Amino acid sequence: MARTAPAASFESLESDLDQKFAYPASSKTYITGSRPDIRVPLRTILQTATRTEKGEMANPPIPVYDTSGPYSDPDVHIDLKAGLPPVRAKWIEERNDTEVLTGLSSEYGLARANDPATAHLRFAQLTNPRRAKAGANVSQMHYARKGIITPEMEYVALRESLNLQALYDKPEYKALLRQHPGNALGAALPLRPEDMTPEFVRREVAAGRAIIPANINHTELEPMAIGRNFRVKINGNLGNSAVTSSLAEEVEKMVWSIRWGADTIMDLSTGKHIHETREWILRNSPVPIGTVPIYQALDKTGGIAEDLTWEMFRDTLIEQAEQGVDYFTIHAGVLLRYVPMTADRVTGIVSRGGSIMAKWCLAHHKENFLYTHFDEICEIMKAYDVSFSLGDGLRPGCIADSNDDAQFGELRTLGELTAKAWEHDVQVMIEGPGHVPLQRIQANMDEELKHCYEAPFYTLGPLVTDIAPGYDHITSGIGAANIGWMGTAMLCYVTPKEHLGLPDKEDVREGIITYKIAAHAADLAKGWPGAQLRDNALSKARFEFRWEDQFNLGLDPERARSFHDATLPAEGAKIAHFCSMCGPKFCSMKITQEVRDYAASLPEAERGMQEKSIEFVKTGSKIYS
């Protein structure tokens, strides 16, 4: 899937997916749960054999977490106009606490459905939405607190563990599964893969330390968890604007993002046909989709924040919930009394949602209607199992503004709202900054854990310096790795175009890979069981000059291969025992292998003297220390 030009149509995108999506040297495999319809996907990276003087030694396949859905399964034909298979439909029906509505409940949704001008844009295979039966609560938190382990929870447990426990008794994995002890900084990670059980997942969701964003109307979803005691996740953003783009382009952006490893997607569309764009994305997305409903509500007013009303916003929530949106960013913590605190900031209020609500509060001199109507919002959320992503509308937009009274005042209000949402058994995560220098990051994590009761933290970076426009995927990736280690559950990616323009596909790829690195570095630091397996496999391949395995085990095989081939394009270079950096005579790994081979050929006594000789040279060739 190397094409960078946007798809002109769904037909051309489907053709591209069928031909180019497959990962190199990989197979799509599934773990089956307690019932045959719990089929958890993972990717298995196949390795070549190690060549020795005694012959070839096989290297085992490496299982990795996979977010690509059916798009990477060669046995599945992708039909974007039909959408993905409804893998959760039966689970939801069996619970018998929802009902299929006779039609849409949202006034705006009905208007769009009945507008002849939008007929050519609509997803054709729509079914009527579901909603909780009267008096029912259908959230994963509600089930967890009742002691019920849902298929979604079992799915998550299998997905997080990758069934790695089955590898520990296999001799070919013994060296590869070695791992440095981590420092979880207070998190209660599973100690071994087998400790990641459905019951573990249930307890974490019941306590509010994790969420499973899974709207009952997003049946195509492959369930995943966001929580401090799970793998660190990343989010990718997409969305049209007033100047871009087609429906096919937006679906392509979603598929492109999950191909590189996005665990969730936020649709931040602000242009034309927001409703129809979101429908196409949801019906074809295997990962949770989040939105910022205030953006669409503002669009309905013609962009005039003062004209927003609770009734209009409520209708937007229902419209999006009935489409299947899994989590909403709600800026309910932007209170009237906090707005003046931003007056002396260098960059003021940088959140779009935060600035919209601040303007509304000042124009009406009233409290934020998202705050005053919060209980009513909770009633909507639990009827569809939409999770809260409580927005940080007052996040700092530069490091000079970090950790100020406005930011932390809002955070404490988000903690108050978290407790209120939990009274309704509604799932919650907390959004965080932003721009924070390294030495001030820990305070953000500490404040969130204390005041938001360990609800999952979801941060945008943070960027640790403001001097690098064009490289803010790096400035933020540094902060993301640190705050991920400290306990942040999900990292929102930043692309090289941050603060400069709308990212294209290559910018999205760059941002996602940067954040996959940050998330993985955090998992290693925390000591996630089995996290070092892929590192060890790649290191072994590097030492043995198995170039193809090095490429394929990496996060971006295409880039690794292209960099290597830029200077050594011949096929023979793929088995050469050197690269273009050192050349054949100065490769440290080749020299080390020669030393090992030489030492192995010596008699034992002589070998010992040879080892001492090498040790003497390595320590500086000094007789006296």
Curated annotation (Swiss-Prot):
Entry GO CC: cytosol
Details of cofactor binding: Binds 1 [4Fe-4S] cluster per subunit. The cluster is coordinated with 3 cysteines and an exchangeable S-adenosyl-L-methionine.
Keywords recorded for this protein, A-Z: 4Fe-4S, Iron, Iron-sulfur, Lyase, Metal-binding, S-adenosyl-L-methionine, Thiamine biosynthesis, Zinc
InterPro entries the UniProt entry points to: ThiC, ThiC-associated_dom, ThiC/Bza_core_dom, ThiC/BzaA/B
Pfam family, one: ThiC_Rad_SAM
Gene Ontology terms for molecular function: 4 iron, 4 sulfur cluster binding; carbon-carbon lyase activity; zinc ion binding
Cofactor annotation: [4Fe-4S] cluster
Pathway membership, UniProt: Cofactor biosynthesis; thiamine diphosphate biosynthesis
Keyword Metal-binding appears in the UniProt entry: yes
Gene3D superfamilies xref list: 6.10.250.620, Radical SAM ThiC family, central domain (3.20.20.540)
Binding site for substrate: N237, M266, Y295, H331, S351, R352, G353, D392, G393, L394, R395, E431, Y458
GO biological process: thiamine biosynthetic process; thiamine diphosphate biosynthetic process
Reactions catalysed according to its record: 5-amino-1-(5-phospho-beta-D-ribosyl)imidazole + S-adenosyl-L-methionine = 4-amino-2-methyl-5-(phosphooxymethyl)pyrimidine + CO + 5'-deoxyadenosine + formate + L-methionine + 3 H(+)
Residues noted as binding [4Fe-4S] cluster in the record, renumbered to the chain: C579, C582, C587
EC nos: 4.1.99.17
Quaternary assembly: Homodimer.
Similarity-based family: Belongs to the ThiC family.
Listed PANTHER family: PHOSPHOMETHYLPYRIMIDINE SYNTHASE, CHLOROPLASTIC, THIAMINE BIOSYNTHESIS PROTEIN THIC
NCBIfam families in alphabetical order: PRK09284.1, PRK13352.1, thiC
Function: Catalyzes the synthesis of the hydroxymethylpyrimidine phosphate (HMP-P) moiety of thiamine from aminoimidazole ribotide (AIR) in a radical S-adenosyl-L-methionine (SAM)-dependent reaction.
Protein name per the record: Phosphomethylpyrimidine synthase
Organism lineage: Bacteria, Pseudomonadati, Pseudomonadota, Betaproteobacteria, Burkholderiales
Gene: thiC
